Amino acid sequence: MPNPVLLYCLVLLAGMGTSQGENTQSEETCTHFPGGLPHMLRELRAAFGRVKIFFQTKDQLDDMLLSESLLEDFKGYLGCQALSEMIQFYLVEVMPQAENHSPDVKEHVNSLGEKLKTLRLRLRRCHRFLPCENKSKAVQQVKDAFSKLQEKGIYKAMSEFDIFINYIEAYMTAKINS
């Protein structure tokens, strides 16, 4: 039985009209992405480390925003959509507000956002990692809880960014191993 990853990349290349013997950026990204993932996750963790203490000391709430049900969505059939929606949530709703909480963290939050955008771009280039359409109820629960927390939601979401990185890692590890 052929390797499904190899088969998918071949179908992707054929669909793009790639002639035999040419290497495309998508093919390169798809082939090399799994090997570069640990480095990308280290970069995300290092960037978050620059703002972690700021946001975690301001987060005075005991309840978790990023729940176990979200991790289960990441690991299950909704993993693709959950990851895509959570990246969008952090980039559109959380980080722009987080940048405005202190001039000391603005540059670092911006850098963290750029690294997250780079990850999203690389995931999209290799469709194997983000081929999704369904909505995740767990992500909607995170968004609803975030909205209810109002200003405190920024501190909560940013203080749990390391958990989000762990969920990304769990999703990607499952995809790479499947």
From Swiss-Prot:
UniProt-listed PANTHER family: INTERLEUKIN-10 (PTHR48482:SF5), INTERLEUKIN-19-RELATED (PTHR48482)
Residues carrying sugar: N134
Assigned keywords, A-Z: Cytokine, Disulfide bond, Glycoprotein, Secreted, Signal
Membrane-spanning parts: none
GO molecular function: cytokine activity
InterPro entries (UniProt xref): 4_helix_cytokine-like_core, IL-10, IL-10/19/20/24/26, IL-10_CS
Principal location class: secreted
Alphabetized Gene3D superfamilies for the sequence: 1.20.1250.10
Record text on subunit structure and interactions: Homodimer. Interacts with IL10RA and IL10RB.
Disulfide-linked positions: C30-C126, C80-C132
GO terms (BP aspect): immune response; negative regulation of B cell proliferation; negative regulation of cytokine production involved in immune response; negative regulation of inflammatory response; negative regulation of interleukin-6 production; negative regulation of membrane protein ectodomain proteolysis; positive regulation of B cell apoptotic process; positive regulation of cytokine production
Signal peptide coordinates: 1-18
Function statement: Major immune regulatory cytokine that acts on many cells of the immune system where it has profound anti-inflammatory functions, limiting excessive tissue disruption caused by inflammation. Mechanistically, IL10 binds to its heterotetrameric receptor comprising IL10RA and IL10RB leading to JAK1 and STAT2-mediated phosphorylation of STAT3. In turn, STAT3 translocates to the nucleus where it drives expression of anti-inflammatory mediators.
GO CC annotation terms, alphabetical: extracellular space
The protein, known as: Interleukin-10
Protein family membership: Belongs to the IL-10 family.
UniProt KW Secreted keyword: yes
Keyword Signal found: yes
UniProt xrefs under Pfam families: IL10
Gene designation per UniProt: IL10
